[in-house]
């Protein structure tokens, strides 16, 4: 079990490098929203993130980021959630999304994963 010195929290907006991608996956240095639980992040060498795109094309699994996102404007791609190593990808915190934005991301992620909605 690995303990990260400063674990990322759900809703953190981080900049990182998306490499080794194929097809329609997002690539390059870009922001992403952390969706994994803080306790998991503190004990694992991985975090789960949704990459962010600037493209506003309509899609039910895109969530518009709120204004308090550290100056990042865009959409979280909920259907492209992935596990990444924040150290290997040089992740840096840039800000946080609002509680309402994180709740919207989690609700759409539950649909993608076939999980029951939160009560």
Locate the predicted segments by residue:
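Conserved functional hotspots at enzyme active or ligand-binding sites that engage polyanionic ligands
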Residues: 1-119
